[in-house]
Protein backbone atom coordinates (compact mmCIF):
# COMPACT_ATOMS: atom_id res chain seq x y z
CA UNK A 1 0.00 0.00 0.00
CA UNK A 2 1.20 3.48 -0.86
CA UNK A 3 0.02 6.69 0.75
CA UNK A 4 0.37 9.73 -1.46
CA UNK A 5 -0.86 13.30 -1.25
CA UNK A 6 -2.66 12.92 -4.58
CA UNK A 7 -3.99 9.76 -6.20
CA UNK A 8 -6.93 10.38 -8.53
CA UNK A 9 -10.39 11.95 -8.47
CA UNK A 10 -11.67 9.27 -6.08
CA UNK A 11 -8.91 9.64 -3.50
CA UNK A 12 -7.74 6.03 -3.84
CA UNK A 13 -7.29 3.25 -6.35
CA UNK A 14 -5.97 -0.27 -6.67
CA UNK A 15 -4.31 -2.12 -9.51
CA UNK A 16 -4.08 -5.74 -10.59
CA UNK A 17 -0.78 -6.29 -8.92
CA UNK A 18 -1.64 -5.94 -5.29
CA UNK A 19 -0.98 -2.19 -5.30
CA UNK A 20 -3.24 0.08 -3.27
CA UNK A 21 -2.77 3.85 -3.43
CA UNK A 22 -4.59 6.09 -0.95
CA UNK A 23 -4.55 9.88 -0.81
CA UNK A 24 -3.54 11.40 2.50
CA UNK A 25 -5.23 14.68 1.56
CA UNK A 26 -8.62 13.45 0.37
CA UNK A 27 -11.38 14.44 2.79
CA UNK A 28 -13.03 11.10 1.99
CA UNK A 29 -10.10 9.29 3.63
CA UNK A 30 -10.07 11.07 6.99
CA UNK A 31 -10.54 9.14 10.22
CA UNK A 32 -12.38 5.85 9.92
CA UNK A 33 -13.02 6.53 6.23
CA UNK A 34 -9.31 5.98 5.61
CA UNK A 35 -9.59 2.50 7.09
CA UNK A 36 -12.76 1.84 5.11
CA UNK A 37 -10.99 3.01 1.95
CA UNK A 38 -8.04 0.67 2.53
CA UNK A 39 -10.44 -2.23 3.09
CA UNK A 40 -12.45 -1.25 -0.01
CA UNK A 41 -9.39 -1.04 -2.25
CA UNK A 42 -7.98 -4.25 -0.81
CA UNK A 43 -11.19 -6.08 -1.70
CA UNK A 44 -10.68 -5.09 -5.35
CA UNK A 45 -7.81 -7.58 -5.46
CA UNK A 46 -10.48 -10.30 -5.78
CA UNK A 47 -12.57 -8.56 -8.44
CA UNK A 48 -11.97 -11.23 -11.08
CA UNK A 49 -12.94 -14.09 -8.79
CA UNK A 50 -16.06 -12.32 -7.50
CA UNK A 51 -17.06 -11.23 -10.99
CA UNK A 52 -16.70 -14.79 -12.29
CA UNK A 53 -18.72 -16.28 -9.42
CA UNK A 54 -21.53 -13.77 -10.02
CA UNK A 55 -21.34 -14.27 -13.79
CA UNK A 56 -21.72 -18.04 -13.37
CA UNK A 57 -24.89 -17.48 -11.34
CA UNK A 58 -26.24 -15.21 -14.09
CA UNK A 59 -25.47 -17.81 -16.76
CA UNK A 60 -27.52 -20.40 -14.82
CA UNK A 61 -30.51 -18.05 -15.08
CA UNK A 62 -29.81 -17.10 -18.70
CA UNK A 63 -29.41 -13.49 -17.62
CA UNK A 64 -26.73 -10.83 -17.77
CA UNK A 65 -24.62 -10.00 -14.78
CA UNK A 66 -25.70 -6.50 -13.74
CA UNK A 67 -23.02 -3.87 -14.20
CA UNK A 68 -22.04 -2.33 -10.89
CA UNK A 69 -23.10 -5.17 -8.61
CA UNK A 70 -19.56 -6.26 -7.74
CA UNK A 71 -18.55 -2.68 -6.89
CA UNK A 72 -21.69 -2.34 -4.81
CA UNK A 73 -20.61 -5.46 -2.91
CA UNK A 74 -17.24 -3.87 -2.22
CA UNK A 75 -18.74 -0.59 -0.97
CA UNK A 76 -21.34 -2.37 1.15
CA UNK A 77 -18.93 -4.90 2.67
CA UNK A 78 -16.25 -2.33 3.54
CA UNK A 79 -18.84 -0.08 5.18
CA UNK A 80 -20.36 -2.95 7.13
CA UNK A 81 -16.94 -4.07 8.37
CA UNK A 82 -16.25 -0.67 9.91
CA UNK A 83 -19.78 -0.29 11.26
CA UNK A 84 -19.43 -3.59 13.13
CA UNK A 85 -16.36 -2.30 14.93
CA UNK A 86 -17.69 1.23 15.43
CA UNK A 87 -21.47 1.22 15.87
CA UNK A 88 -23.03 4.35 14.44
CA UNK A 89 -20.43 4.65 11.68
CA UNK A 90 -22.00 5.99 8.48
CA UNK A 91 -20.53 3.94 5.61
CA UNK A 92 -18.62 5.89 3.00
CA UNK A 93 -21.07 4.84 0.27
CA UNK A 94 -23.86 6.57 2.20
CA UNK A 95 -21.71 9.58 3.08
CA UNK A 96 -20.61 10.34 -0.47
CA UNK A 97 -23.87 9.34 -2.19
CA UNK A 98 -22.73 6.23 -4.04
CA UNK A 99 -26.18 4.67 -3.84
CA UNK A 100 -27.71 7.74 -5.50
CA UNK A 101 -25.17 7.70 -8.34
CA UNK A 102 -25.67 4.55 -10.37
CA UNK A 103 -25.79 1.81 -7.73
CA UNK A 104 -29.24 2.56 -6.30
CA UNK A 105 -30.75 -0.72 -7.52
CA UNK A 106 -28.27 -2.72 -5.44
CA UNK A 107 -28.62 -1.20 -1.97
CA UNK A 108 -31.82 -2.97 -0.88
CA UNK A 109 -30.78 -6.39 -2.26
CA UNK A 110 -27.42 -6.03 -0.53
CA UNK A 111 -29.14 -5.16 2.75
CA UNK A 112 -31.62 -8.03 2.43
CA UNK A 113 -29.33 -10.72 0.98
CA UNK A 114 -25.65 -9.86 1.47
CA UNK A 115 -25.87 -8.49 5.02
CA UNK A 116 -27.39 -11.75 6.35
CA UNK A 117 -24.47 -13.59 4.73
CA UNK A 118 -22.04 -11.20 6.45
CA UNK A 119 -23.92 -11.95 9.68
CA UNK A 120 -23.11 -15.65 9.25
CA UNK A 121 -26.31 -16.90 7.65
CA UNK A 122 -25.98 -19.03 4.53
CA UNK A 123 -23.08 -19.43 2.13
CA UNK A 124 -21.45 -17.00 -0.25
CA UNK A 125 -22.68 -19.16 -3.12
CA UNK A 126 -26.29 -18.90 -1.88
CA UNK A 127 -25.98 -15.15 -1.36
CA UNK A 128 -24.53 -14.62 -4.84
CA UNK A 129 -27.32 -16.74 -6.36
CA UNK A 130 -29.99 -14.66 -4.61
CA UNK A 131 -28.31 -11.38 -5.52
CA UNK A 132 -28.27 -12.38 -9.18
CA UNK A 133 -31.92 -13.49 -9.05
CA UNK A 134 -32.84 -10.06 -7.71
CA UNK A 135 -30.60 -7.86 -9.84
CA UNK A 136 -29.69 -9.60 -13.12
CA UNK A 137 -31.02 -8.22 -16.36
CA UNK A 138 -32.53 -10.00 -19.31
CA UNK A 139 -30.28 -10.46 -22.34
CA UNK A 140 -31.20 -8.27 -25.28
CA UNK A 141 -33.60 -9.87 -27.73
CA UNK A 142 -32.26 -10.72 -31.15
CA UNK A 143 -34.14 -9.01 -33.89
What are these regions (language model features)?
Residues 1-14:
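Auxiliary, metal-adjacent structural segments of Zn-dependent hydrolase domains
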Residues 7-10, 27-29, 52:
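Solvent-exposed loop/turn segments at secondary-structure junctions
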Residues 11, 15-18, 71:
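Mature, well-folded catalytic/scaffold domains that follow N-terminal targeting or propeptide regions
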Residues 15-22, 46-60:
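Flexible internal linker/loop segments at domain or repeat junctions
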Residues 21-38:
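Short pre-active-site segment immediately N-terminal to the catalytic Zn-binding motif
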Residues 36-49:
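Active-site recognition of the HExxH zinc-binding catalytic motif
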Residues 50-51, 58-109:
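Post-HExxH zinc-binding segment in Zn-dependent metallohydrolases
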Residues 90-143:
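Pan-zinc metallopeptidase signature
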Amino acid sequence: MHVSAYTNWAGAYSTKGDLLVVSSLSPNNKGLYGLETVFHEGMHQWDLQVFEALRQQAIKLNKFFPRGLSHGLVFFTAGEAIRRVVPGHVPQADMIGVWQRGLRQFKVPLEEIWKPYLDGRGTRHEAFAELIKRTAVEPPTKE
